[in-house]
Amino acid sequence: MKFLDSAKIYIRSGDGGAGCLSFRREKFIEFGGPDGGDGGRGGDVVVECVGGLNTLIDYRYQQHFKAKTGVHGMGKNRAGGRGADAVLKVPVGTQILDEDGETMIADMTEAGQRLVLARGGNGGFGNAHFKSATNQAPRRVNPGQEGVERTVLLRLKLIADAGLVGLPNAGKSTFLATVSAARPKIADYPFTTLNPQLGVVGCDGREFVLADIPGLIEGAHEGIGLGDRFLGHVERCRVLLHLVGADTEHAGKAYKTVRRELEAYGGGLADKPEIVALSKVDSVDPDTLKQQAMRLKRAAKRAPLQLSAATNLNVQKALRAVLAEIDAAAVADAAGTAADAVVWAP
């Protein structure tokens, strides 16, 4: 399935049904009076968050959505039926923005979450509604209220517990394929990964979701390479696993390049907990490995993990470190929520 993380759609709720102009006509009833029913309400445009989706590709081929018009009122005081809703299904993690691209309407973060984007128009009154002591045979009816029309933007930010970042060819896809059932494309040339990939990782009887995003290069925040637009998919991650290939020219410079791009992107990415690992250690000789490890240690100001996804060296150690950071972030979030809670007192 092709990946698409943004879409512009045009929506319109249904018009209300018109009221009915009708009079009671029966044998032996000389003055039957008005019996026109009210029109039905127009359908709503509803966004529903569903599990099992991780792309907005459906909205590439259809951008216009309109709910059904309410049924018109009928004689014998019969009201019209309600118009059918237009339901838009989106993946978990979809943000709904106004046409300006900045005003947030909603953030769909849970499966089953529903939001009415455009409410249908009310149905018009039939002539029975206007009967009075001074007007026994009204010929007045209301048309249905018009529906609401608007343009909205959908932006998907995948929800993962941890994110893989690094330069192209740092071994991110190989790592994801080793620790999960995900099967990203793997090759020895840059930008093999063109779209974010998700994998469910098992570690010590527990599971978490790991996201692999396309590699960053210097100047990505200015649009060079694939740009930095995919960094939005790790905004929700609680921890970043930063892989630096041991076969790169200078591990320290490679690390600093990615850090500069994270800081330039903003969104709090540079402040997230980070685990630094020197990957592909099986691809270099011991002297080169020692030199690269020292360079990375000086740049990151901490001793990096040394791992190899191809030989499984220290892979479990890296996963346990990620899991520990996820747990620490969860505890911090819970403490923050408790601190913000208002204590009720009589």
UniProtKB/Swiss-Prot annotation:
Binding site for GTP: 166-173, 191-195, 212-215, 279-282, 308-310
Single GO biological process annotation from the record: ribosome biogenesis
Residue stretches making up the OBG-type G domain: 160-327
One example GO MF annotation: GTP binding
Protein residues bound to Mg(2+): 173, 193
Superkingdom field: Bacteria
Residue span, Obg domain: 1-159
Keywords annotated in UniProt: Cytoplasm, GTP-binding, Hydrolase, Magnesium, Metal-binding, Nucleotide-binding
Pfam families membership: GTP1_OBG (PF01018), MMR_HSR1 (PF01926)
Keyword Magnesium in record: yes
Entry's localization field: Cytoplasm
Entry GO CC: cytoplasm
Main subcellular location of this protein, as a coarse class: cytoplasm
Family annotation (PANTHER family): DEVELOPMENTALLY REGULATED GTP-BINDING PROTEIN-RELATED, MITOCHONDRIAL RIBOSOME-ASSOCIATED GTPASE 2
Function of the protein: An essential GTPase which binds GTP, GDP and possibly (p)ppGpp with moderate affinity, with high nucleotide exchange rates and a fairly low GTP hydrolysis rate. Plays a role in control of the cell cycle, stress response, ribosome biogenesis and in those bacteria that undergo differentiation, in morphogenesis control.
Similarity remark: Belongs to the TRAFAC class OBG-HflX-like GTPase superfamily. OBG GTPase family.
Subunit organization: Monomer.
Listed name of the protein: GTPase Obg
Gene: obg
